[in-house]
């Protein structure tokens, strides 16, 4: 209900002024005081799986370039490309062997530069996935580092003697199973690897490492990159005394005892490194997105930095912790996100998280629920990051046999851990044998859902998920209330309908989302609060507004402009 609207609108106006004043501190802003990335819609591209231009079964730079018009038409402002640097591909590019080139499987540096130029012509920014914590064990730095204890790059990595002969320096475990220490018999020391043994951690306490990594970002900025998504930024530093982590009981999928990662994650020194990376980014009006797995908003706030001088967009995964349609849970998460000290970010799926189509779907109304979830995270204040194929309703397709698994996590953790292949399948461009992704067998199988959920077919259907995404993104780009308006929750005891206002100056947009499988009719008391009606901006099915009431289909959406 809107009974408190008149009193609240004054407070909202004051808050709007405060928010705009804070935003005006941004180095380069638009007329409304916003940096380019604040109003942008980001789109994550997994390059192996997006578009294959040379028909080798693997996506590439030229494939991405060929789909720029599609992305522009969708409403995308920035593309985040997951790792594309040269790599042995032990962990699909998160093991980098050269930070200043493109992996041949994806094309050449010239291909990338062409992509950046073509994207710029369309007003699309390019964001690269940058892995600052570790390299490949095939990187020239590490090959030199392990060559002798006195090599020039020895201190670029973390080498230590064993606690006693035959035992690693401490009890730290790798996130992918087993000890986080690998013994090198040639130099009789262990090196540290938070991830796989083929991904040795860099020593960020070494000033030469820090300077080199800063310089690498400059190298890419000069080639047209508008920012970086920083992988695993919370683990850049480790306790120099290598204290054992507390053991918490129980065992993970790899059989290791669970630990509290007290001494090898989230150390305070991380923030100094982030401030350095941000200083370089500001020279180029670039954005830094951070992979920050935080337990709550208070911890997330640390990564914005004092005075917002670290990450502009620390990734908030709070929505991914709500895997059911619960108005109460989403109200709680939205309130937490809106209390953050910096600009919010919204993510509901990515290359490490099962697709939202399956996580929230009930098996019967999945298409409607996909539209509902889009309506939620695209009508909130902040920067949304879409995962490729979300706009189609792509499904998570989990392998059923170990021999079909490509992801090393799935191969080593099977059957308890089946890996991430399911959310990395080829983009579904049409209903052909390989979904228009390639003319040869793709690196991962195309899901059966490509027959019904693909770009070609959905582009022709005005009621498709894709058509609804296009409508929402167009609305988001043009509606000031959705871009900058404050959030005002409504009917907070309603267990079936999540509803709220986005209020900007004296204008308001009503968002009503039915998170139940039964029709709902909600009285918002519009006339009592000085409004004649709610004019539909976007709605699903037969969801509509009449007088004070909004009627919603099962899992229905109504987004309306309040009119006086």
What is each of the regions a protein language model found here?
Residues 1-9:
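Bacterial N-terminal signal peptides that target proteins for export
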Residues 525-540:
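Solvent-exposed beta-hairpin/edge-strand motifs
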Residues 546-564:
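C-terminal beta-strand-rich structural cap/linker in extracellular carbohydrate-active enzymes
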Residues 9-18:
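Bacterial N-terminal signal peptides
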Residues 23-218, 222, 235-295, 427:
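Acidic/aromatic-lined carbohydrate-recognition and catalytic surfaces
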Residues 136-146, 289-323, 394-406:
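Substrate-binding cleft/loops of secretory-pathway carbohydrate-active enzymes
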Residues 37, 241, 245-263, 271-281, ...:
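Loop/helix patches that line or flank the sugar-binding groove of alpha-linked glycan CAZymes
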Residues 143-188, 322-339, 410-447:
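Core domains of carbohydrate- and sulfate-ester-processing enzymes
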């Amino acid at each position: 209900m809107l009974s408190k609207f008149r009193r609240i609108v004054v407070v909202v106006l004051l808050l709007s002024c405060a928010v705009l004043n804070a935003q005006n501190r941004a180095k380069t802003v638009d007329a409304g005081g916003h940096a380019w990335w604040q109003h942008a819609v980001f789109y994550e591209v997994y390059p192996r799986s997006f578009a294959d231009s040379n028909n080798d079964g693997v996506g590439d730079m030229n494939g991405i370039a060929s789909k720029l018009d599609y992305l522009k038409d969708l409403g995308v402002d920035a593309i985040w490309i997951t790792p594309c640097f040269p790599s042995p591909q032990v962990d699909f590019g998160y093991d980098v062997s050269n930070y200043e080139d493109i992996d041949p499987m994806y094309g050449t540096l010239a291909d990338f530069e062409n992509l950046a130029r073509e994207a710029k012509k369309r007003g699309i920014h390019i964001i690269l996935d940058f892995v600052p914590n570790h390299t490949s064990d095939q990187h020239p730095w590490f090959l030199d580092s392990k060559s002798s204890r006195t090599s020039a790059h020895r201190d670029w990595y973390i080498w230590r003697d064993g606690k006693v002969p035959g035992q690693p320096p401490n009890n730290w475990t790798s996130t992918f199973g087993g000890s986080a220490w690998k013994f090198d018999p040639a130099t009789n020391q262990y090196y540290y690897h938070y991830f796989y043994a083929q991904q040795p951690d860099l020593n960020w306490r070494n000033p030469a490492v820090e300077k080199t990594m800063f310089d690498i970002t400059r190298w890419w900025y000069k080639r047209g990159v508008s920012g970086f998504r920083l992988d695993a930024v919370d683990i850049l530093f480790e306790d120099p005394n290598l204290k054992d982590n507390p053991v918490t009981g129980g065992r993970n999928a790899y059989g290791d005892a669970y630990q509290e990662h007290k001494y090898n994650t989230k150390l305070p020194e991380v923030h100094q490194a982030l401030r350095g990376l941000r200083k370089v980014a500001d020279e180029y009006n670039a954005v830094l997105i951070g992979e920050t797995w935080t337990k709550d908003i208070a911890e997330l706030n640390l990564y914005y930095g004092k005075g917002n001088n670290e990450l502009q967009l620390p990734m908030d995964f709070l929505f991914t912790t709500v895997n059911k349609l619960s108005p109460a849970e989403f109200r709680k998460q939205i309130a937490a996100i809106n209390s953050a000290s910096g600009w919010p970010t919204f993510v509901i799926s990515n290359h490490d998280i099962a697709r939202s189509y399956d996580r929230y779907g009930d098996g019967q109304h999945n298409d409607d629920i996909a539209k509902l979830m889009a309506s939620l995270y695209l009508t909130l204040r902040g920067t949304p990051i879409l995962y490729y194929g979300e706009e189609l309703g792509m499904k998570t397709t989990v392998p059923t046999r170990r021999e079909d698994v490509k992801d090393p996590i799935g191969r080593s953790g099977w059957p308890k851990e089946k890996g991430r292949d399911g959310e990395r399948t080829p983009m579904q461009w049409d209903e052909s044998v390989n979904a228009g992704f390639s003319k040869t067998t793709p690196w991962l199988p195309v899901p059966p859902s490509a027959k019904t959920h693909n770009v070609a077919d959905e582009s022709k259907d005005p009621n498709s998920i894709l058509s609804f995404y296009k409508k929402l993104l167009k609305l988001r780009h043009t509606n000031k209330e959705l871009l900058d308006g404050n959030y005002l929750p409504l009917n907070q005891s309603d267990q079936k309908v999540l509803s709220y206002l986005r209020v900007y100056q004296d204008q308001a947009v009503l968002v009503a989302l039915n998170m139940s499988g039964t029709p709902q009719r909600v009285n918002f008391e519009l006339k009592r609060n000085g409004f004649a009606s709610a004019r539909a901006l976007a709605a699903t099915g037969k969801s509509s507004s009449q007088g004070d009431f909004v009627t919603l289909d099962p899992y229905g959406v109504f987004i309306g402009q309040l009119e006086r």
